[in-house]
């Protein structure tokens, strides 16, 4: 018989048939797996215990001033967003070859890449497991739509970096809307779904446009701080976006402001860790007025967000002050942060 030919006796053998676990056997296997829960979650829990600003949780609490969600459902939504946000950070750090997260070594440098990827994927499904608690099957639809959106945005960002292709600002805004805006939208859409004011929200006002603007402000500010903030240097390392080869907002503006100067584009391709080279790149970005452009764009978007908040405050019962405070948290003049 040929070595590649199937053994019919083996194919028909009942020993090879997969049988469902039942009774004590099922309980035993479940108990064994449960004993590994802490190990499986270790990369995730390590990241979770690092200090952070918890902007997304504060945003959820702020919007609840308008939406009045029952406390149990509000905690479910916060947990879903927390799980997804931290899972995405685990994957981001691997894809970006990051070394620091919040001032300490990234998870995959401690637990290894395979275990960290598994922990991140595990967290995605822990989040999905929470959805039935919201009591509406549409929650699954929202969850799927926004996770697909998040991965589309991440794919665009990775493609530009790996292909050394500088996007336009319009393409950048589209990417941010998908990637950064995805979790913001997921939170608010689930909140609208669970709100005691559901009838009012769906028939008169939609909070998603405001959340989209907040997401863009958050990302541009983050891009600015990556290259200009001392605190960011302590937490993530100096000019990490340059080492990563990332087309961030100030870098895109700088390259497109002077297409004949290939110095900045060339530095991005090098994935440099040399501080002197990165300092030179920062000077190139300054020379094209790109940091000022960032601040102007942030100010423009903050004004747009405040107008949307004002309109919401005039038409939706509840206080707008909490949302204003979240805007202050993510939209202050970058140099003061």
From Swiss-Prot:
Residues that, per the record, bind dimethylallyl diphosphate: 101, 179-180, 219, 226, 236, 246
Protein residues bound to Mg(2+) 2: 92, 96
Catalytic reaction(s) noted: isopentenyl diphosphate + dimethylallyl diphosphate = (2E)-geranyl diphosphate + diphosphate; isopentenyl diphosphate + (2E)-geranyl diphosphate = (2E,6E)-farnesyl diphosphate + diphosphate; isopentenyl diphosphate + (2E,6E)-farnesyl diphosphate = (2E,6E,10E)-geranylgeranyl diphosphate + diphosphate
Pathway: Secondary metabolite biosynthesis; terpenoid biosynthesis
EC number: 2.5.1.-, 2.5.1.1, 2.5.1.29, 2.5.1.10
Disruption phenotype annotation: Results in faster growth and increased resistances to heat and UV stress. Also leads to increased virulence using S.furcifera as the insect host.
Residues bound to isopentenyl diphosphate: 53, 56, 85, 102
Residues binding Mg(2+) 3, per UniProt: 222
GO molecular function list: (2E,6E)-farnesyl diphosphate synthase activity; dimethylallyltranstransferase activity; geranylgeranyl diphosphate synthase activity; metal ion binding
GO biological process: alcohol biosynthetic process; mycotoxin biosynthetic process; terpenoid biosynthetic process
Record site feature (Important for determining product chain length), residues: 124
The keyword Cell inner membrane is annotated on this UniProt entry: no
Family classification: Belongs to the FPP/GGPP synthase family.
Name used for this protein in its record: Geranylgeranyl pyrophosphate synthase subD
Organism: Metarhizium robertsii (strain ARSEF 23 / ATCC MYA-3075) (Metarhizium anisopliae (strain ARSEF 23))
